[in-house]
Every structure is written in C-alpha cells, then in structure tokens.
C-alpha cells in the first residue's frame, strides 16, 4: 500500500511540474501578445490606418469560434497589412511632399544628385532612400539651388558626382538588391543566368542604381563599378557576363579592397588585394575579363564559365554604354569559347611582356609588364589553355552535338585537336612497301603525344 501511495505522489509531483511549465509558457505567450498589441497600436498611429481591432484578434484566439463563421475571407497578419500600407503611405508621402505639378526637381544627395524634369524618375531614385530632394516652379530655380548646394560640398574643378563611376562607392547599392543571398556565393542556376542576361539586354537608366551598365559592343556583357552589390557581381561573374570591373580602395579604410569583391572566388579576391597594395594603391584599377558562357542541362550546370582576367590601372576612360537585345543561344557559347582561346594564345606570342598573377582551373589572372614573361608564366598560360584547345577538362561535359559544333569552330587553330576531330591520314600508295624491319623500328605514338604535338603546332610561346 505504501508503495502505491509513493508512486501516486510521484505522479502528482510530475503533474505539478508540468502544470508549472505550462503556466510559464502561457505567461510567455501572454507577454508576447501584449508586445504585439502595443506594436499594432503604434503602427496604427504611424500609418493613420485602421488595422484589425484588438478584440477581433482576441476572439480569433478562442477555441470556441467555429471555422464556418470565418468564411473564405483571407485574414492578413498585422505585419502584412503594415508592409502594404507603409509602402503605399511612403509613395503618397513623397507625392505630397514634392508633388507632380513642379517643373523641375533637384536631388541633393546620393549617386543621382542632379536636376530632373521627370517626377517619376525622381521618385524612383529617392523612394526608401535617405536622399534630400525638392521641387521647384521653374528650371532656373532648380539650377540655382543645385549650384548653391554643389558649391558647398565640392571644389570648383571637381567633376560632378553623377558623371563618374566613383560615386557608387558612396552609396550602399546593396540595399537596392532584393532577394539575393546574404550568405556566401553558391553555384549559379540556369534561371539566375537567364535573369542576368535579361537584366543586360533590357537595361534601362533606372537600372543603373544596381551598379552596372551594358557593354554589348562585342558580346553580351556588363561593366560593373565600385559600389556594385557583391552578390550580384558574383552572379554575373559566374554567368560569364562581365567585361570590366572597376575597383578602388575602400573609402576611409586604407589598404582595404572594395567590398564589391567580397563574393568573388577567394583566389581572385586575394589577387585584387595584392594588386591594389603593390601597384594601384589609392588609384582606381580595372579587371578586364574575357569569359565563356556556362552551359546548363535541366537546371544543372554542365560547364561553368572560364575566365581570362587582366588587371590594370584605370585611365578614367570607360567602355561605351551599348545595349543589344538578343536571346541566348548555343552559337553565342561557341563564339565565347573561340574568343577566349584567341585572347589567351596572344600571351607568349604577340604579347611578350606579361606576368601571371593567379591560375586556377576556371581563371587565369595576368597583368602587363615591361620585361618579357618568365618561363613559369608561359607554362601556366599553356596549361590553362589546354582544356580549351583539346575540349577536355571542364569542356569534357559538353553535350555531344555542342562539342562537335565547338570543335568545328576551333578547326581554324592548328593547335586544336579533340576527340570530335576527324583525322584523315593520307592513303598508302600501292607501290609503297615497308619491310618487316622497318615496321619493327616504327615507334607507336599515343593519343596523348598526338594531342601534345598538335597543341604545340603553330603556337610557340617564345
């Protein structure tokens, strides 16, 4: 009997502990609900709108309410309502502050400071940004106000901020990129590649606040500058869609490379850092990039982009903004492989003075020097170009038909020889007799030796 009583008391003690835990949980929920209620009241005052009444929220929490009384109407959370109303209120506030009846507008801060006559453009640039702006009744008033403000913060001979790419270093463009990953770089997807392609081919002036503009004079590419978002820059780099990147020492941080490079491959990022410390210092420098486009199959990346990167000091002369509206096709991929190989093979032939700063399977970084290239640099160039000339390495994953089409394009180079090549040996003459001794003395040549000799034919790195 005593044993049974002891067991029941233990059960009672356990139940008491569970009840106490539930009380603590309930008190925590009540406390959180009170905080939410205060948040609702605060937001109602800020937005000037009527949100879901507190009594309705309380009733919705009661288990006695049946599902049939709710109907099919969707009940939005206070956060959803606030987000919608706040966005609307923000635009209405801008319209009310400046208005659309003015004839000219001035933006005093940020990369887009200047005079505008289209209110919609002004609103797109100042919305959700801490920029000062004002509307004027005449263009003359706007010009006078802009001139006075400009004289206060700049020297007379300084170039206007909106006319130089350095302006983007002063603006946190990352806030304008929504939906991009905040973690480290990850493998590019096919959907992301086509999104980037569309961002170039359908670029508008309003898109410039993302930190790039199109450079489609030779291929579909983009030029990125100092304040570009690191994740967007990394995505375009993996897409093989960059022709130039302009970088400079971070403002206020001596020796620190631009944050735009933070999501690039670590080897390339380290090379940029070393180049800045050794050569560029506080000057603006560039990365001139020649790349192949990646190849996908059912969302999976078969062949990543391969890059040749040349680093140099900027002369403040930038590529022309040129848009070409075209869709991606595999002939563009084939041309990108051909162009990359044509650029690489110049190092050691027509370009004598260069130095290889970094080499990986996907990237070769070089800079031009006065002296002739060292033998080690020439060897690295030959190693890097080998999988292009033979369509091996990363290009071994190309679909059969695409590899064959790429092979046909590469036939113009004597150094090209791949498994898709058709080798036509000369027919033996009927009168040609080879003795057994001569046959035995003939050395067999392996396929590797054929590839090597074909690669070196007509392309000597002197």
UniProtKB/Swiss-Prot annotation:
Pfam families: Cauli_VI (PF01693)
Compositional bias segments (type: Polar residues): 443-462
GO BP terms in the entry: regulation of translation
InterPro entries: Ribosomal_bL9/RNase_H1_N, RNase_H1_N
Other known facts: The inclusion bodies are the site of viral DNA synthesis, virion assembly and accumulation in the infected cell.
Family listed: Belongs to the caulimoviridae viroplasmin family.
Biological role stated in the UniProt entry: Enhances the translation of downstream ORFs on polycistronic mRNAs derived from soybean chlorotic mottle virus.
Protein name as catalogued: Transactivator/viroplasmin protein
Lineage, broadest ranks: Viruses, Riboviria, Pararnavirae, Artverviricota, Revtraviricetes
């Amino acid at each position: 009997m005593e044993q049974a009583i002891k067991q029941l008391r233990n059960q009672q003690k356990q139940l008491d502990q569970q009840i106490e835990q539930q009380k603590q949980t309930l008190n925590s929920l009540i406390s959180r609900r009170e905080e939410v209620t205060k948040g609702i009241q605060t937001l109602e005052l800020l937005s000037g709108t009527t949100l879901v009444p507190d009594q309705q929220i309380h009733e919705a929490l009661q288990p006695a309410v049946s599902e049939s009384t709710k109907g099919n109407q969707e009940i939005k959370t206070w956060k959803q309502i606030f987000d919608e109303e706040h966005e609307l209120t923000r635009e209405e506030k801008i319209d009310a502050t400046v208005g659309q009846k003015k004839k000219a507008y001035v933006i005093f801060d940020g990369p887009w400071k200047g005079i505008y006559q289209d209110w919609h453009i002004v609103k797109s640039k100042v919305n959700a940004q801490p920029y000062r702006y004002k509307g004027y009744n005449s263009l003359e008033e706007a010009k006078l106000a802009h001139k006075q403000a400009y004289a206060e913060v700049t020297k007379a001979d300084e170039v206007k901020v909106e006319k130089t790419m350095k302006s983007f270093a002063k603006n946190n463009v990352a806030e304008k990129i929504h939906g991009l990953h905040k973690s480290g770089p990850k493998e590019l997807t096919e959907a992301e590649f086509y999104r980037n392609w569309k961002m170039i081919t359908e670029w508008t002036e309003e898109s410039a606040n993302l930190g790039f503009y199109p450079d489609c004079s030779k291929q579909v590419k983009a030029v990125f500058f100092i304040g570009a978002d690191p994740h967007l820059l990394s995505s375009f780099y993996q897409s093989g869609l960059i022709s130039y990147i302009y970088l400079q020492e971070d403002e206020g941080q001596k020796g620190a490379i631009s944050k735009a490079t933070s999501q690039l491959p670590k080897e390339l990022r380290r090379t940029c850092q070393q180049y800045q410390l050794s050569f560029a210092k506080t000057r603006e420098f560039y990365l001139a990039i020649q790349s192949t486009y990646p190849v996908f199959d059912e969302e999976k990346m078969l062949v990543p982009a391969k890059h040749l990167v040349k680093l140099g000091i900027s002369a403040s002369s930038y590529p022309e903004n040129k848009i070409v509206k075209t869709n991606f096709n595999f002939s563009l991929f084939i041309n990108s492989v051909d162009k990359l190989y044509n650029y690489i093979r110049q190092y050691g032939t027509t370009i004598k003075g260069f130095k290889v700063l970094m080499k990986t399977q996907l990237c070769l970084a070089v800079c031009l020097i006065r002296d002739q290239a060292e033998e080690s640099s020439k060897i690295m160039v030959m190693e890097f170009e080998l999988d292009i000339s033979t369509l091996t390495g990363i290009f071994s994953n190309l679909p059969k038909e695409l590899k064959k089409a790429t092979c046909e394009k590469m036939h113009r180079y004597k150094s090209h020889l791949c498994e898709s090549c058709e080798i036509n040996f000369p027919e033996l003459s009927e009168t040609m007799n080879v003795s057994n001794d001569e046959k035995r003395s003939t050395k067999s040549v392996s396929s590797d030796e054929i590839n090597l000799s074909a690669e070196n034919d007509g392309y000597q790195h002197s």
